[in-house]
């Protein structure tokens, strides 16, 4: 059965309930008062200072695997439902970690009847014969922990049937707050008689698996994760959520709420994580050619400069290190680009946050799901920019990739604008830095560096790739129309904007997060059991 057709049919009634004139949730600031109050009798909870605030985190590592049996106490069967971006990685990581910990817990995959993903699941060791692969509702009925990792749009279409199929006392596990946002928007909520938790890796699924595999000899590596305990009827939900994160290989976990998570996550991927960086590269590629560069050099000075130099500095030394490493004219060029780009980028980013917080962006995803049978997801790397990029990558010399100061100014300005919108909305530093910095430089940009923008975007979720395609052109347009023309017309550098960047407290938070980064750098070209997508 064609998934696009099936999803479109399932969403018909869901979209009607979630029509544009439906009551939307009020845009609200995220309260920090509900966070940083968790405790654990199993894992060590650390207090970390992020800029002017203190937050609680749990640091992961393979040395914690012996604690997993206690964290998963009472869980005998886990059902991982779906096989999209996150499910293949999380299912394999959980299976491997629980086995290493000596847990007698069965991890099963649940899929739609007739799904083409059955074969992909078999290829990595799940099977009907071993009772680790089956039809989704059969698996849901058996599971003590239901990890609902089907697409957000499918969750919105099927949530009633899924809740009804869950056995009494089972825990619902999510990796995104989207379903909460959807239910909130239509005046509904999760059933009161179940635990509802979330563990949300701050990176695409393939990177969750790749870093787990590559970090086996360094006490584990993976992708940082947020966790949320939305309902705790059993009194064990926090320990289970933390155990889930440790089993995934998360270097550290920080607390959030489902509401804060979906606002920051949906917003972030439309911004610097995916949509904005796509728009930045396209606009700079054209600009540099207008200035006389060859197509190949224009790609080097735009995309390659971001993924091969700028993001690597940010990953290990922080955002400000990019600026501090420049001298003389290069630093002045950075200031011009940063000053001109900050407010135009922030204008779009504030619009995105408002659209997400109001429920409008959730409606976009739901409605796109309804249209997908008629209008399948298309390629985004057919433009001259990305075609030239294939040639550049084939001839690449990593040691000679430039750090273009203008490119750096535009990219860093957009990243900082994204950070400021989240901070102004009340999100904690741990969430802000992970959704604006760490995920970009440690999970996503390495994929664009390896194979281009489509390889990065299309290995993310349906929600992410929908939003990236929608908002990338907006960044492309506003930077071209407002930022670059301001520079070309000789508009003076706004020293207040530069001063705010130089003294921003987020630099302290990023510095602290750099200490908690994965123990290895991701290698995208090495062998892996992860599922990765290329749209032909």
Tell what function each PLM region has.
Residues 2-25:
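N-terminal chloroplast transit peptides
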Residues 28-75, 111-112, 229-231, 245-257, ...:
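Glycine/serine-rich phosphate-binding loop and adjoining beta1-alpha1 elements at the start
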Residues 35-62, 221, 282, 290-536:
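NAD(P)-dependent Rossmann-like dehydrogenase/reductase catalytic/cofactor-binding core
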Residues 47, 95-126:
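NAD(P)-binding Rossmann-fold cofactor-contacting core
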Residues 75-94, 396, 415:
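Glycine-rich adenosine-cofactor-binding loop
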Residues 112-113, 122-181, 189-207, 213-215, ...:
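Rossmann-like NAD(P)-binding element
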Residues 174-270, 328-329, 358, 370-400:
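Rossmann-fold dinucleotide-binding core
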């Amino acid at each position: 059965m064609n998934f696009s057709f099936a999803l479109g049919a399932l969403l018909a009634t869901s979209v009607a309930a979630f029509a544009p004139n439906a009551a939307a949730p009020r845009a609200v600031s995220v309260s920090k008062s509900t966070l940083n109050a968790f405790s654990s009798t199993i894992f060590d909870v650390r207090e970390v200072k992020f800029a002017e605030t203190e937050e609680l985190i749990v640091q992961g590592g393979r040395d914690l695997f012996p604690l997993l049996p206690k964290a998963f106490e009472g869980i005998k069967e886990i059902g991982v439902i779906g096989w999209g971006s996150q499910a293949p990685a999380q299912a394999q990581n959980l299976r491997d970690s629980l086995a290493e910990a000596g847990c007698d817990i069965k991890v099963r995959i649940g899929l739609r009847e007739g799904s083409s993903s059955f074969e992909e699941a078999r290829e990595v060791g799940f099977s009907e014969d071993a009772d680790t692969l089956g039809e989704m509702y059969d698996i849901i009925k058996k599971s003590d922990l239901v990890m609902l990792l089907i697409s957000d749009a499918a969750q919105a279409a099927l949530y009633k049937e899924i809740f009804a199929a869950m056995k009494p006392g089972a825990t619902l596990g999510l990796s995104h707050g989207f379903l909460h946002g959807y239910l909130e928007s239509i005046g509904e909520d999760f059933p009161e008689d179940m635990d509802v938790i979330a563990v949300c890796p701050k990176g695409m699924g393939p990177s969750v698996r790749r870093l787990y595999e590559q970090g086996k000899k360094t006490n584990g590596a993976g992708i940082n994760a947020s966790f949320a305990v939305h309902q705790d009827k059993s009194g064990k939900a926090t320990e289970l959520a933390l155990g889930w994160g440790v089993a995934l290989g998360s270097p550290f976990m920080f607390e959030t709420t489902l509401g804060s998570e979906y606002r920051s996550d949906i917003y972030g991927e439309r911004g610097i994580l995916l949509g904005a960086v796509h728009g930045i590269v396209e606009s700079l590629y054209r600009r540099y050619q207008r200035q006389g560069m060859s197509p190949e050099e224009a790609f080097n000075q735009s995309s390659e400069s971001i993924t091969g130099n700028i993001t690597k500095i940010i990953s290990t030394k922080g955002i400000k290190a990019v600026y501090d490493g420049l001298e003389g004219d290069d630093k002045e060029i950075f200031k011009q680009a940063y000053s001109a780009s900050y407010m135009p980028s922030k204008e779009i980013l504030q619009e995105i946050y408002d659209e997400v917080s109001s429920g409008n962006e959730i409606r976009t995803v739901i409605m796109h799901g309804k249209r997908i049978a008629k209008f399948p997801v298309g390629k985004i790397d057919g433009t001259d920019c990305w075609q030239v990029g294939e040639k550049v990558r084939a001839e690449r010399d990593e040691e000679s990739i430039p750090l273009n100061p203008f490119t750096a100014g535009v990219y860093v300005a957009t990243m900082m604008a994204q950070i400021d919108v989240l901070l102004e909305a009340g999100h904690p530093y741990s969430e802000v830095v992970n959704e604006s910095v760490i995920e970009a430089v440690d999970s996503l940009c390495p994929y664009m560096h390896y194979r281009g923008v489509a390889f990065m975007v299309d290995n993310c979720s349906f929600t992410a790739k929908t939003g990236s395609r929608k908002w990338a052109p907006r960044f492309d347009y506003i930077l071209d129309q407002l930022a670059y023309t301001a520079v070309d017309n000789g508009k003076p550098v706004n020293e207040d904007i530069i001063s705010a960047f130089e003294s921003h407290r987020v630099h302290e938070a990023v510095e602290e997060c750099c200490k908690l980064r994965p123990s290895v750098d991701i290698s995208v070209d090495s062998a892996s059991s992860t599922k990765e997508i290329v749209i032909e």
